[in-house]
Amino acid sequence: MRIREIEPIVLTSKEKGSATWASIMIVTRVITENGEVGYGEAVPTLRVISVYNAIKQVSKAYIGKEVEEVEKNYHEWYKQDFYLARSFESATAVSAIDIASWDIIGKELGAPIHKLLGGKTRDRVPVYANGWYQDCVTPEEFAEKAKDVVKMGYKALKFDPFGPYYDWIDERGLREAEERVKAVREAVGDNVDILIEHHGRFNANSAIMIAKRLEKYNPGFMEEPVHHEDVIGLRKYKASTHLRVALGERLISEKETAFYVEEGLVNILQPDLTNIGGVTVGRSVIKIAEANDVEVAFHNAFGSIQNAVEIQLSAVTQNLYLLENFYDWFPQWKRDLVYNETPVEGGHVKVPYKPGLGVSINEKIIEQLRAEPIPLDVIEEPVWVVKGTWKNYGV
C-alpha cells in the first residue's frame, strides 16, 4: 500500500496537565492510497511549530512509498537529511510517521504490533507512576501524594526532589532533596521502588554529592544525573557510585544509543519511540540493550498514542524493567483520545490485542481539539518540570 497523505495535527485544550507540554499533542495521521489510516505521535516540548513543519518536510520523502517498507523508508530519510542524527525535529517527525506506518501494517494484517515483532513475552506490562507530584514542595506533601499513588496499585514511582536547583546544588538543596526522598521512602515502605529524576541538569560533582546523600534510601535508579551531553561527567559519575543510571529519552539514533550501552554508561535504557525512530529503530535498540545486559524502561510521558505503542513494544521486550506511566495524570482529553486503552491494575497494564497500536482513535476528539500550531510560553518554571515543584521550602 502506497502512502497518499501525511498530516500533522496539533491538539490542545483548556484542560491542562501536570507539566506545560502536557497541554498539547502533535498527532500524525498517515493515509494510504486504499484509505487505510494510521496514527503516530511526535514530541512537542517548546518546539511545536518547528516539529509541525518538520513533519510536513519529512512527509515529502514518504508520500508515494510503500507503507510496509518501514526500514527502507527510514533509511531513505536518513540518507536525505544530513542532520537527522543531530536534529530533534527531524527525529521526532520520522518517528511519528514510522509509528503510524506500523499501525497501518497491523491493521492490514489484522494483528497488534507486538505480534508483528515476534509475539509478546508477557501479558501484562509493569509500570511506574510519574506526574503524580504536581504542586508538591514540602516533604509532607510528597509523602501524602506518594501514599495515594501506592493505594492506586503502583509498585514503583518516580519524582524529582531537587526543586529549582540547576547545574550546581548547595547544602540547602541537598538537605531539601534528602528530606523529600526520606519522607517518600517512609510513606511507601521498602517494598515500593522509588526512582529519582534529575532531568539531566547537574554537573558531575553536584550529581555525585546527590548520589552519596540519597543512596541510603535505596533508589531503583538515578535518571539523567548529569547534563545529557556531558559524557566525561557521566563516566566520572559512574565511577563514583554503585547506583544504577537510567537515561535515553534524548537519544535520537540507533548508533548514539549503542555508544552509551556498549560503553557501559547506562544500566537502564529509556528510549522514547516518539524520537528514537519509532518502532523500526526502537526494536533495534531493545536488542542492543539486551545483548549488553541492560534493562529497558521506555520513556513515556507525552500522550496516549505514545502510551499505546510503548505498551506494544514493552510486551516484546525480554529485558524490560518497567514502563513509565503518566496515564493516570493525563488531562482527561488525552485519555478520551483513544478507545480500548487498558487501565493500571496492581501496578501493571494488560497488553491490548486490537490490530496495529492495540487501540482505536476517537476521531471526534481530534476534530474538536484541532488547533493551529502556536509557540508555548517560556516561563520561570521550565517546560519539563512537573508543575508547582520549582520551589524551595522553609527558610
From Swiss-Prot:
Miscellaneous field: D-gluconate dehydratase activity is lost after incubation with phosphatase, whereas no such decrease in activity is observed when the enzymes are incubated in the same reaction mixtures without phosphatase. Analysis of the amino acid sequence of D-gluconate dehydratase indicate the presence of several putative phosphorylation sites on serine, threonine and tyrosine residues.
One MF annotation (Gene Ontology) recorded for this entry: gluconate dehydratase activity
Protein's name in the database: D-gluconate/D-galactonate dehydratase
Reported temperature dependence: Optimum temperature is between 80 and 100 degrees Celsius. At 80 degrees Celsius, the dehydratase is stable for over 2 hours, but at 90 degrees Celsius its activity is decreased to less than 50% in 2 hours and its half-life diminishes to 120 minutes. At 100 degrees Celsius, the enzyme has a half-life of less than 40 minutes. The activity is almost undetectable below 60 degrees Celsius.
Site (Transition state stabilizer): 324
EC numbers for this chain: 4.2.1.140, 4.2.1.39, 4.2.1.6
UniProt site (Increases basicity of active site His): 272
Pathway: Carbohydrate acid metabolism; D-gluconate degradation
Domain of life from the UniProt record: Archaea
Co-factor binding comment: Binds 1 Mg(2+) ion per subunit. Can also use divalent metal ions such as Co(2+), Mn(2+) and Ni(2+).
